[in-house]
């Protein structure tokens, strides 16, 4: 083996050793919480004789997450931080604020209870609740007992339970879900909201209201950027003059047009008309209905 080959092998071995050291050091750092700065730190003993550190104007670092508060009581033996006053938890664009939290270092868990906690993500969506757990290792929040999320455009989604994943850019809402967007109100039991695409996915049965119009369906979605609603599965729509049934329906909100597909039935009490087809398109600007594919119309006189 030549001298040049030996040098390459030695260099690779050194690089491997350095890489292993860096990864090992990163893993080691994640295990420990650091007090980055504080105005003052005092060691205090409680009634049970256990010592803890009291830090004023404290900033902690753990899992790449900053924990900032007015006062922190750090129970070192149990590895728990009780933070109080202007509490802020910040991690890669996700920020949680409240008046208090308990941080369980060994579990990577920030636990908010009782007071209002606000979660703001990179897209400036704001969620408020009273019961929330945030895992700093996987960047996932779990909330319960009621929450409300408002996006940057004013759209509101409410539910009893749910989750938020910073990495997936995803809110999930479960149980008694209500969605308010301008003049539209939707009620369901399970909704996923993708913050990067501003798309809401309704995973269970839907009740939809717009002005005096009502619609029900098995599932669907809403793309806010394009202002398109899609409903599928036993779609049933009711207006003051019409009633419709179909397999799937697209509602184009800006032009206020409607496209129906599948097994379509239309009953129009204003014109005493009944129609069936496999395709129906309603164009609002012209107030016209176009029927295609196995279309038939009956007029009651």
Question: Where in the sequence are the language-model features?
Answer:
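N-terminal amphipathic/hydrophobic interface segments
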Residues: 23-301
């Amino acid at each position: 083996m030549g001298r040049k080959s030996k040098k390459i092998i030695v260099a690779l071995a050194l690089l491997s050793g350095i890489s292993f050291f860096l990864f090992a050091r990163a893993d080691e750092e994640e295990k420990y919480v650091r007090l980055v700065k504080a105005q003052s730190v005092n060691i205090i003993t409680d009634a049970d004789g256990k010592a803890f550190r009291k830090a004023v104007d404290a900033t902690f670092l753990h899992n790449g997450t900053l924990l900032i508060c007015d006062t922190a009581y750090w129970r070192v033996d149990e590895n728990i931080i009780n933070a109080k006053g202007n509490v802020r938890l910040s991690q890669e664009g996700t920020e949680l604020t409240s008046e208090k939290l308990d941080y369980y270092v060994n579990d990577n868990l920030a636990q908010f209870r009782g007071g209002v906690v606000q979660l703001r993500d990179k897209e400036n969506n704001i969620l408020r609740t009273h019961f929330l757990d945030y895992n700093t290792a996987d960047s996932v929040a779990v909330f319960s007992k009621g929450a409300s999320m408002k996006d940057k455009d004013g759209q509101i989604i409410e539910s009893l339970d749910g989750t938020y994943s910073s990495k997936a850019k995803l809110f999930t809402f479960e149980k008694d879900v209500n969605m308010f967007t301008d003049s539209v109100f939707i009620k369901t039991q399970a909704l996923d909201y993708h913050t990067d695409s501003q798309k809401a996915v309704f995973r269970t049965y839907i009740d939809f209201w717009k002005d005096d119009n009502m619609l029900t369906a098995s599932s669907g979605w809403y793309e806010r950027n394009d202002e398109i609603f899609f409903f599928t599965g036993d779609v049933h729509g009711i207006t003051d003059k019409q009633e419709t049934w179909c397999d799937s329906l697209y509602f184009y909100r800006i032009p206020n047009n409607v496209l129906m597909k599948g097994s379509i039935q239309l009953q129009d009490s204003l014109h005493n008309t009944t129609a069936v087809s496999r395709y129906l398109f309603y164009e609002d600007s012209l107030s016209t209905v176009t029927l295609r594919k196995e279309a038939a119309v009956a007029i009651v006189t």
